[in-house]
Design a protein with these regions (language model features):
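Short, solvent-exposed beta-strand edge segments and adjacent coil->beta transition regions
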Residues: 2-4, 82, 183
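Extracellular/periplasmic solute-recognition and catalytic clefts
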Residues: 1-11, 34
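Append "and occasionally in soluble cytosolic enzymes with long acidic Gly/Pro-rich linkers
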Residues: 14-108, 173-181
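Beta->alpha turn/N-cap motifs
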Residues: 1, 29, 48, 141-146
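Ligand/substrate-recognition segments at binding pockets and active sites
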Residues: 73-146, 157, 171
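Extracytoplasmic/peripheral linker and loop segments enriched in polar/acidic and small residues
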Residues: 18-21, 33-34, 108-127, 153-188
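Small-molecule pocket liners
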Residues: 1-5, 45-46, 155, 170
Length: 188
């Protein structure tokens, strides 16, 4: 299973690509693997796990808190901002992950309140919404896997604009008409 941090693109400040990039630079992924997973994980540098046919390495985005602070300043958040991070899991490892993320983001001025969600609460808060404007999610730690090794079964559910809650799991509320067309065309 590939775990990831969803950033709700519908709302500020996460609608700004510079903020999303800053968060990526603010997190020391190698240290996260050591601290939260005791070394039993591998940082991923793309949307598809490296084992998937056709997976493209998009990074790495090295740990660079100075670059993160610069991007936040460019985006209009020189002093950072406050937000909430929900975990879709309430186990010990996930607790370590969100605590680590909270500490890393604090170093660049992003104050994060964390909450580990019980499964029923997660479903209610994440999936039982009327649409993007109704969502209370801002940062969401979750995972996704597909045993078929069909990239469509990864990309469509979590990134296609028609798959936003309450329909399915595009909890980033990512919406890009060109991307949707490419995903749809790839099925033909």
């Amino acid at each position: 299973m590939q775990k990831h941090l969803d950033l709700n693109n519908f709302f500020k400040p996460f609608s700004d690509n510079r903020v999303r990039q800053a968060i990526n630079y603010a997190i020391n992924k190698d240290a996260l693997v050591k601290v939260a997973y005791n070394g039993y994980a591998v940082p991923q540098y793309g949307i598809l796990a490296s084992q998937y046919p056709g997976a493209v390495k998009l990074g790495p985005w090295p740990y660079n808190p100075q670059k993160a602070r610069e991007l936040l300043k460019e985006a209009g958040y020189p002093n950072g901002f406050s937000t909430i991070l929900w975990s879709g899991y309430n186990d010990t490892t996930s607790g370590k992950v969100v605590q680590f993320l909270q500490q890393q983001l604090a170093q660049v001025g992003i104050k994060v309140e964390t909450k580990l969600l019980e499964p029923g609460v997660r479903t209610e808060l994440i999936l039982h919404v009327k649409g993007a404007a109704d969502s209370k999610s801002r940062l969401f730690y979750i995972g996704w896997s597909d045993g078929s090794f069909d990239p469509d079964q990864v990309l469509r559910p979590i990134l296609h604009s028609t798959q936003q809650p309450p329909v399915y799991m595009n909890t980033t509320y990512y919406a890009n008409k060109h991307f949707d067309e490419l995903i749809d065309k790839a099925l033909v």
